[in-house]
From Swiss-Prot:
Gene name of the record: MT-CYB
A Pfam cross-reference name: Cytochrome_B
Lineage of origin: Eukaryota, Viridiplantae, Streptophyta, Embryophyta, Tracheophyta
Cofactor binding summary note: Binds 2 heme b groups non-covalently.
Transmembrane segments: 38-58, 82-104, 119-139, 185-205, 231-251, 295-315, 327-347, 354-373
Identification of the protein by name: Cytochrome b
GO molecular function: metal ion binding; ubiquinol-cytochrome-c reductase activity
Entry's localization field: Mitochondrion inner membrane
Note: Heme 1 (or BL or b562) is low-potential and absorbs at about 562 nm, and heme 2 (or BH or b566) is high-potential and absorbs at about 566 nm.
Binding residues for heme b b562: 88, 189
Gene Ontology terms: cellular component: mitochondrial inner membrane; respiratory chain complex III
Species the sequence originates in: Pisum sativum (Garden pea)
Length: 392
């Protein structure tokens, strides 16, 4: 048997053929831009988090009397431990940055529309899992901000009528954030990334059922090329740029995205003057603060994810690409500016004028999803280039 025949025989095996179908010979629109590379970057970030997390867990002790010191032990005594910790801590931020760009690219190019509704829904589930994973990972360092952040966020469950206090006690494993809470959060933080891997594979399989969208929103069976080698090379450029960007944070600004109070051991007696979550929680924190009543603030969080889930089912877009929808472009950039404003408001103290200003961005955020169907109707006069039967 020749080498070529042996290679072809291997590609026909079940696992090899699946990998070949989805990662090598996968038909891809020829006009994809670099914005379509953030999906593979997110996968790389997930692998980095799992690998560094496993090695860090080998040296971590999930006990309230030892957790903080075990983290310092990793930093001071374990060879390369500082690199592992900074890669893991900053890797979480890089992961969220990449996923945010991936989400906003999908919003701009309407990649969520028919027939890819399920792809979008799985993406929202993955995003929600990422938020929970990030929160459970913020507690194990057991610094002052970790302790009080866990106390404040878990206490929000008490706003649920009837069963709220019971849920809080169950989350804590007692009547306050203590050793049981730390063990639970550490265990969940170790488990959730592997659930994320499974959800990501489902997300990829759902995407490959109908194929990728493209910047023009034009579906064509003819104008497609195999993923390898063309887009591997294109993605490789993005991977190198990401590696440089990631390295700058690790080696030159490893603590910029953290909080200095987390270098103080957790102490339930003094309350920090300003409890601030990690930057990726700031928009949610701003929405929570925008409504004075705690129950109202908690209730405002659910519609954020409901709107993201419902967006693919707004059957109103005759033209998919924002290149042909100037009104949608303007609304999109307004949403992006609003998202940045939410992040800025979330890190400000709860005082005037930030309280008043903070009530405007959540309104604009929900307004975006309310008016999204309108530009699609207005733009129906522009030629509809998408002719796939699945979208009729």
């Amino acid at each position: 048997m020749t080498i070529r025949n042996q290679r072809l025989s291997l590609l026909k095996q079940p696992i090899s053929s699946t990998l070949n179908q989805h990662l090598i010979d996968y038909p891809t629109p020829s006009n994809l831009s670099y914005w379509w590379g953030f999906g593979s970057l997110a996968g790389i970030c997930l692998v980095i988090q799992i690998v560094t997390g496993v090695f860090l867990a080998m040296h971590y002790t999930p006990h309230v009397d030892l957790a903080f010191n075990s983290v310092e032990h990793v930093m001071r005594d374990v060879e390369g431990g500082w690199l592992l910790r900074y890669m893991h801590a900053n890797g979480a931020s890089m992961f969220l940055i990449v996923v945010h760009l991936h989400i906003f690219r999908g919003l701009y190019h309407a990649s969520y529309s028919s027939p890819r509704e399920f792809v979008r829904c799985l993406g929202v589930v993955i995003f929600l899992l990422m938020i929970v994973t990030a929160f459970t990972g913020y507690v194990p360092p057991w610094g002052q901000m970790s302790f009080w952040g866990a106390t404040v966020i878990t206490s929000l469950a008490s706003a649920i009528p009837v069963v709220g206090d019971t849920i809080v006690t169950w989350l804590w494993g007692g009547f306050s954030v203590d050793n049981a809470t730390l063990n639970r959060f550490f265990s969940l933080h170790h488990l959730l990334p592997f659930i994320l891997v499974g959800a990501s594979l489902l997300h990829l399989a759902a995407l490959h059922q109908y194929g990728s969208n493209n910047p023009l929103g034009v579906h064509s069976e003819m104008d497609q090329i195999s993923f390898y080698p063309y887009f591997y090379v294109k993605d490789l450029v993005g991977w190198v740029a990401f590696a440089i960007f990631f390295s700058i944070w690790i080696f030159y600004a490893p603590n910029v995205l953290g909080h200095p109070d987390n270098y103080i051991p957790a102490n339930p007696m003094p309350t920090p003057p300003h409890i601030v979550p990690e930057w990726y929680f700031l928009p949610i924190h701003a929405i929570l603060r925008s409504i004075p009543d705690k129950s109202g603030g908690v209730a405002a969080i659910a519609p954020v994810f409901i709107c993201l889930l419902a967006l693919p089912f707004f059957k109103s877009m005759y033209v998919r690409s924002s290149s042909f929808r100037p009104i949608h472009q303007g609304i999109f950039w307004l949403l992006l500016a609003d998202r940045l404003l939410l992040g800025w408001i979330g890190c400000q103290p709860v005082e005037a004028p930030f309280v008043t200003i903070g009530q405007i961005p959540p309104f604009v955020f929900f307004l975006f999803f309310a008016i999204t169907p309108i530009p699609g109707r207005v733009g129906r006069g522009i030629p509809n280039y998408y002719t796939d039967e699945t979208d009729q």
